[in-house]
């Protein structure tokens, strides 16, 4: 059977149901040999779909992101499960295509990346490489497209705030809308079963029909959570906060500024690329954890529109294990609907994390050694954004820094080089980006690069950094060095309060 779970991080995770299924497997060996299908990563490193991470319980996983799911990353690395990675938005939209009765979904997203069946086909370990592709290349009017094949769903697990006695389900206290209804409809198309976890059951007729996310006719089973403080939390870090679901607003000054460190320094430099009216996406890591807080501290949040793949607009974003939600939002739409925008028109600027930068401008953010975090929404967003700004430290693995007297000092160099001749996995295709005319930048704590016609160009260096010994000698390839190589703006080193960010004009 194929089981589909709808959530993101620990937001909207049906914890009671997942725990009960794990308990049953450990006691009886059933259910077993499942395929687990999920668009978003669904854990906080401990709970969520980690409950399914047992050899024999799941024999195939099809998902987008496992960065907060160490047990899944371990099982995939050890070849204990068949593992396919597909772009998060494509899975979310595939639910809609399947619900419509279509055999799959056609898209440009994924071409030229490790999802492309001519490269890796999204197969994340050796055992999966021997298996059939679940994506194809097709041609329509002489243009190439990816085709994401249907994945029939037997059981769909969802979560809501409450159901009435007819089963009509609302999600009013959830911090995201997600793609609940398309997934439910997809399951119904194949005769599948829908199981919903809720906090409470209310009298029929007491719900506002406009707030019903799933009509009761589509729900087969309702599980009322008996321990909501532990198993129906709004997100991992707290049980419920009305400011994260639009039921309250908090004063802007009550939202704390981020502490100054290399991550904030990098985010500040990245934010200098913003302009009035820009529609922006923030990916996981430094972008989501820091860029929004920098914008709030600088007082420019209302002059741009920050979005996150979950479907939120505006506000100040939570970070880390609470990725995808925010306070003081202006709007919230479905996850699959957000991906319509990201895949179609595309945002003006996206900020993304970076694992490796290759000589041709390609980027790996999905697999480091045998450790596969997966793509998440990275490919959906970066392939269609007008400008892509990658944010990350120059090296990884234990680097330590000192910011003093408006200079940067490297106290301890990272053990892992991130500037490599060829990336280990093709998450972002540099040559394709150049061909499309995308603007691409890479911002680190000591250097700023941009993608140009002939490769990767170094355009800025931090004060206090030696070009040869601390940049060029730490790279596996030699970048083009700009004739107008600049020193990074000294204002970035201001440690207390705003640094004076001024937005560009478009």
Q: Which residues does each predicted region cover?
A:
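Nucleotide donor/acceptor-binding cores
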Residues: 1, 31-34, 59, 277-278
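Generic N-terminal amphipathic, Lys/Arg-enriched alpha-helix
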Residues: 1-4, 245-256
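Glycine-rich N-terminal segment of FAD-binding domains in flavoprotein oxidoreductases
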Residues: 3-24, 40, 280-293, 297
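Conserved phosphate- and dinucleotide-binding cores of soluble alpha/beta proteins
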Residues: 9-25, 35-37, 42-52, 57-251, ...
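Short, structurally constrained coil/turn elements
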Residues: 27-30, 77, 300
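Glycine-rich phosphate/ribose-binding loops and adjacent secondary-structure elements
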Residues: 32, 256-259, 264, 268-275, ...
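Long, compositionally biased
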Residues: 498-506
């Amino acid at each position: 059977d194929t089981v589909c779970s709808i959530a993101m991080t620990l937001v909207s995770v049906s914890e009671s149901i997942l725990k009960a299924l794990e308990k049953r497997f450990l006691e009886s060996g059933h259910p077993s040999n499942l395929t687990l299908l999920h668009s978003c990563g669904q854990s906080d490193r401990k709970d969520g779909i980690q409950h399914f991470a047992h050899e024999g319980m799941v024999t195939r996983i099809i998902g987008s992101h496992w960065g907060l799911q160490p047990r899944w990353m371990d099982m995939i690395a050890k070849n204990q499960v068949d593992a396919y990675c597909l772009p998060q938005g494509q899975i979310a939209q595939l639910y809609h295509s399947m619900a419509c009765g279509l055999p799959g979904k056609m898209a440009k997203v994924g071409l030229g990346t490790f999802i492309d069946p001519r490269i890796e086909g999204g197969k994340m370990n050796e055992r999966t490489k021997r298996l059939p592709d679940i994506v194809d290349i097709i041609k329509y009017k002489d243009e190439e497209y990816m085709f994401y094949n249907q994945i029939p769903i037997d059981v769909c697990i969802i979560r809501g705030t409450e159901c009435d006695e007819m089963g009509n389900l609302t999600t009013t206290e959830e911090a995201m809308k997600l793609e609940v209804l398309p997934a439910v409809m997809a399951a119904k198309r194949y005769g599948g079963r829908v199981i919903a976890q809720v906090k409470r059951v209310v009298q029929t007729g007491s719900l506002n029909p406009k707030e019903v996310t799933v009509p009761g006719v589509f729900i087969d089973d309702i599980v009322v959570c008996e321990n909501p403080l532990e198993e129906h939390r709004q997100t991992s870090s707290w049980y419920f906060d009305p400011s994260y679901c639009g039921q309250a607003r908090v004063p802007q000054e009550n939202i704390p500024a981020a502490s100054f460190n290399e991550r904030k320094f990098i985010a500040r430099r990245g934010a200098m690329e913003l302009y009035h009216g820009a529609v922006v996406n923030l990916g996981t890591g430094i972008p989501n954890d820091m860029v929004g807080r920098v914008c709030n501290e600088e007082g420019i949040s209302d002059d741009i529109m920050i979005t996150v793949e979950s479907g939120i607009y505006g506000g100040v974003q939570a970070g880390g294990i609470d990725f995808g939600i925010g306070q003081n939002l202006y709007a919230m739409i479905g996850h699959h609907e957000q991906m319509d925008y990201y895949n179609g028109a595309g945002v003006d600027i996206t900020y993304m994390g970076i694992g490796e930068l290759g000589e041709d401008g390609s980027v790996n953010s999905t697999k480091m050694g045998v450790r596969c975090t997966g793509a998440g929404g990275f490919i959906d967003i970066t392939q269609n954004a007008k400008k892509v700004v990658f944010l990350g430290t120059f090296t990884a693995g234990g680097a330590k820094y000192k910011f003093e007297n408006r200079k940067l000092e490297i106290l301890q160099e990272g053990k892992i080089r991130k500037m490599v001749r060829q990336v280990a996995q093709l998450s972002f295709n540099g040559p394709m980006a150049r061909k499309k005319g995308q603007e691409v930048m890479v911002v680190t704590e000591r250097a700023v690069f941009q993608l140009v016609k002939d490769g990767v160009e170094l355009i800025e260096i931090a004060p206090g950094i030696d070009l040869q010994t601390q940049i060029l000698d730490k790279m596996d390839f030699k970048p083009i060095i700009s004739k107008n190589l600049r020193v990074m703006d000294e204002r970035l080193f201001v440690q207390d309060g705003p640094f004076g960010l001024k937005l560009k004009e478009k």
